[in-house]
Amino acid sequence: MKRVVVLLVFFLVSFALYAATVTVVYLDRSETNLEASSYIKKQGKSNKLPHKFSFASKFSALKGDEKVVVILNSGRSSGTDPRISAYLDTVGNKQTIILVNLYSIGKNILSGSVKSANSDFGVDEISAATQWEDRAGDVQAMHKQWTAELFRLIEIKQAL
């Protein structure tokens, strides 16, 4: 019995050490970014994903060897934060990047994705609403939808 417990602990520690890390970059400590980061982490745990999430508040924190980088683009009604655009213009390997656009778009509950081939930046993109006037809409369902798409893209990128 003791050997089984030791072996189980060994496997759990090994799995934790070798779990793939996904870096989430947010440029501002806005309520939207903090909630989105928290939601990603919470949904990752509830879906029992084998990834560890690390969070960075600036691009300079990236080492360059990340397998997957998620960039949160928020605080806008449309378009991309100029700091994100500038960073994406300099990145060599865009295959590792997922851009998550969290827009304030009024009444619409939007959740959609764009493949890298169709993206202006050459990266996979997900767009979702952060707030809307129609409070009758199911907020949790919308957030679950964009995080499910995010996790699907992470799985694909981890396999590359």
Residue ranges and their predicted role:
Residues 4-13:
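Sec-dependent N-terminal signal peptides
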Residues 19, 65-66, 94-95:
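A general structural motif
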Residues 19-49:
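Short, charged N-terminal beta->alpha structural module
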Residues 22, 71, 79-160:
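FMN-binding flavodoxin-like domain, especially the glycine-rich phosphate-binding loop
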Residues 29-32, 58-59, 75-79, 103-108:
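Solvent-exposed loop/turn segments at secondary-structure junctions
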Residues 44-63:
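A short, well-structured beta->alpha microelement
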Residues 61-76:
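Short, well-ordered secondary-structure micro-motifs within conserved domains or adaptor modules
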